[in-house]
Regions:
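His/Asp/Glu-rich mid-to-C-terminal helical/loop segments that flank catalytic regions of hydrolases
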Residues: 222-254
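Flexible, glycine/charged-enriched surface loops at secondary-structure junctions
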Residues: 49-54, 159-165, 252-254
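Zn-dependent metallopeptidase/amidohydrolase metal-coordination segment
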Residues: 197-233
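Active-site rim beta-loop-alpha module in soluble metabolic enzymes
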Residues: 137-187
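Generic non-transmembrane alpha-helical segments
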Residues: 150-158, 202, 244-252
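Short acidic/polar active-site loop segments enriched in Thr and Asp
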Residues: 97-98, 190, 209
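Metabolite-binding pocket within alpha/beta catalytic cores that recognizes anionic/polar moieties
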Residues: 1-150
Length: 254
């Protein structure tokens, strides 16, 4: 009967929606999932722009400069793959079409010490959200070539040294074991973070562009945890990236 047929289709029961009073966001958005990184970015932004509109939508914030060559919004925090994709889904219904996932990452490579800027080419998924958006368990999620090239050109123009690299997306930072680190090092993985693979999968599912940009905040490559969240190398590099966001996001909108 009709009820049984409806029950077995892949059509969702719940859809992301725009609620009365929700704002419209520009087509380009920087999504900063990590709370400490979002708040640092918002503080930098408020110090740079003459006027910044800050408001809460659902469980995350939107921080939008009133004047920019390319209108854009800073969004976050939304830590972890499920929360980041919930935020991404909401941003899409509010108008986002190009989304840069920005934040800290741990380094698995000696050539990417604290403060290094990493432009991901692929994300190897070890989280659960991407599977629900059609990602295959054994296939990395790839950043689109034009987005990658645009970001790299904008970083070079801003004088920010950077390197390409593959990243590992995990749901469980406390399960970043020595064995796993060695296995991913052997695969040429440069960094580890918590959201990019899921956001790439959801972006592909919804037909929007998603790219990533990370600053190394801590090191795991020696199989010990070296924290650098307050290290001047990380703080300065993250500030430079935030200051360059208008150009970086403009490269995605081009």
């Amino acid at each position: 009967n009709d009820q049984v047929e409806r029950a077995v289709t892949d059509e969702p029961i719940i859809e992301p929606t725009r609620r009365p009073g929700d704002p419209t966001v520009p087509g380009v958005v920087a999504l900063v999932p990590a709370p400490f990184a979002y708040h640092r970015a918002a503080r930098h932004l408020k110090g740079l722009a003459d006027e910044v509109r800050d408001r809460r939508v659902d469980f995350f914030h939107l921080c939008q400069p009133s004047e920019a060559p390319v209108p854009w919004t800073l969004a976050g925090p939304a830590l972890g793959a499920p929360a980041a994709v919930l935020a991404l889904e909401k941003l899409i219904v509010l108008g986002a079409r190009r989304i840069l996932v920005l934040g800290p990452c741990g380094s698995l490579a000696t050539e990417a010490p604290i403060g290094a800027v990493v432009v991901p080419t692929e994300a190897v998924s070890e989280e659960g959200t991407s599977r629900l958006y059609g990602a295959e368990a054994d296939r990395p999620l790839t950043v689109a070539g034009p987005a990658l090239q645009g970001l790299e050109a904008a970083l070079a123009e801003a004088g920010i040294p950077h390197q390409r690299g593959r990243v590992w997306t995990t749901d469980a930072p406390y399960r970043e074991t020595r064995r796993k680190v060695q296995e991913f090092q052997a695969q040429g993985i440069v960094g580890v973070e918590m959201e990019l693979a899921a956001c790439l999968a959801a972006g592909a599912f919804r037909g929007v562009t998603v790219a990533g940009l990370f600053v190394v905040s801590d090191e795991l490559f020696a199989l010990q945890w070296v924290k650098g969240f307050d290290n001047p190398g990380f703080v300065d590099a993250f500030r430079q990236v935030v200051e360059a966001l208008p150009a970086l996001l403009g490269s995605l909108a081009a």
